[in-house]
Design a protein with these regions (language model features):
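Ubiquitin-like/PB1-type beta-grasp interaction modules and other compact soluble beta-rich domains
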Residues: 1-87
Length: 87
């Protein structure tokens, strides 16, 4: 099956693009997308436990099975924004 993988933040920096199409066998969990990314770019290991998964615009657990033509997002932690501290 083929899925579209969308990259943000550290993942986009690692791949130098915002998305790729990857092939996986049937009955593959979404966590395999992260495993492939870490295998190809080992320094992404630091984000393994902090990354969330999205499939077709919904947050999912790491054990959710992929389906052909799914759109997968690896969501690393984000920072920034406004501080609520007035110091």
């Amino acid at each position: 099956m083929i899925v579209t993988v969308k990259f943000f933040a550290a993942y986009q920096e690692a791949y130098g693009c915002s998305e790729m199409r990857w092939e996986f066998p049937d009955n593959t969990p979404v966590s395999a997308v992260l495993e492939r990314a870490i295998a190809q770019h080992p320094y992404l290991e630091q984000w393994r436990e902090l990354t969330r998964f999205g499939i077709n615009f919904e947050f999912v657990s790491r054990n959710t099975l992929l389906k052909n033509e799914d759109e997968v997002v690896l969501i690393p932690p984000v920072s920034g924004g406004l501080s609520m501290n007035n110091e």
